[in-house]
Amino acid sequence: MKIRPLHDRVVVRRLEEERTTAGWIVIPDSATEKPMRGEIIAIGAGKILDNGDVRAFVVKVGDVVLFGKYSGTEVKVAGQELVVMREDDIMGVIEK
């Protein structure tokens, strides 16, 4: 099963954060917060402007992005935990 977002929404799969500190101390799952970066796996058609035009996305599928702690809505599709959010909720793209 796939999810196809509508309009100016994107679907993001969270990327796991490092769970070991510089001193090789392993941080348990219960002490970590959900990561605030992820990979875009699907995008909608674009934002519909007031004049009816559609503005294309700045981001693309495959981009690794940063987003806010409370951004979007968490959904579970085909056993994967995903986040559906508006493009405006994305703070930046991590360049490789």
Swiss-Prot record:
Q: Which UniProt keywords apply?
A: Chaperone, Cytoplasm
The main location class comes to cytoplasm
Any one GO CC term of the record? cytoplasm
Q: CDD domains annotated for this entry?
A: cpn10
- Check the record and name the Pfam families matching this protein: Cpn10
Give the top-rank taxon of the lineage listed in the UniProt record for this protein.
Bacteria
Gene Ontology molecular function: any one: metal ion binding
Annotated InterPro entries? Chaperonin_GroES, Chaperonin_GroES_sf, Chaprnonin_Cpn10_CS, GroES-like_sf
Q: Give a GO biological-process term.
A: chaperone cofactor-dependent protein refolding
Subcellular localization: Cytoplasm
SUPFAM superfamilies cross-referenced by the UniProt entry? GroES-like (SSF50129)
* Gene3D superfamilies reported for this sequence: GroES chaperonin (2.30.33.40)
Asked if the record carries the keyword Chaperone, the reply is yes
HAMAP family (UniProt xref): CH10 (MF_00580)
| Family, per entry | Belongs to the GroES chaperonin family.
Fill in the subunit field for this protein. Answer: Heptamer of 7 subunits arranged in a ring. Interacts with the chaperonin GroEL.
Please give the function described in this protein's UniProt entry.
Answer: Together with the chaperonin GroEL, plays an essential role in assisting protein folding. The GroEL-GroES system forms a nano-cage that allows encapsulation of the non-native substrate proteins and provides a physical environment optimized to promote and accelerate protein folding. GroES binds to the apical surface of the GroEL ring, thereby capping the opening of the GroEL channel.
Query: What is the name listed in the Swiss-Prot or TrEMBL entry for this protein?
Result: Co-chaperonin GroES
Q: Which organism is it from?
A: Legionella jeonii
Q: Which gene encodes it?
A: groES
